[in-house]
Structure formats: C-alpha cells, structure tokens
C-alpha cells in the first residue's frame, strides 16, 4: 500500500482505525483519503485496508494570531 507517497507493507488484515493507531495518528485532527475518496471518521473501524490501497492522511494543526 501507499501512505502519503511512501510504500508500506501490511502484515495482516487491518481496519483503518487500527492502522491509524499503529502509525501514530490521532483520529481527532486528521482527514483520510483512501483511493481518492474521503473516508468519514465514523467509518474508520469498518474500512479494511488492502495492499492495493493508497492513503493520504492530512493532520490539522492549530495556530494563527
């Protein structure tokens, strides 16, 4: 699979929610795109990843004046 442009190998079948935890992402302040489509936060546990998937994960950070 590809994660933010880098190749990753999935060792087992894994749900998106578990993958995010394993990779150190907090699901509270991120957006996930899977194969060109945004995944709603409520679906993270239902989405099973495969080696052919492409994920783009964007983390939101606070800041400003």
Task: Go through each PLM region and give its residues.
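Ubiquitin-like/PB1-type beta-grasp interaction modules and other compact soluble beta-rich domains
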Residues: 1-65
């Amino acid at each position: 699979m590809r994660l933010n442009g880098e190749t990753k190998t999935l060792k087992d079948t894994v749900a998106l929610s578990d993958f995010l935890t394993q990779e150190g992402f907090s699901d509270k302040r991120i957006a996930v795109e899977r194969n060109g489509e945004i995944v709603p936060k409520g679906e993270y546990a239902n989405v099973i990843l495969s080696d052919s998937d492409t994920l783009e994960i964007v983390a939101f950070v606070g800041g400003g004046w």
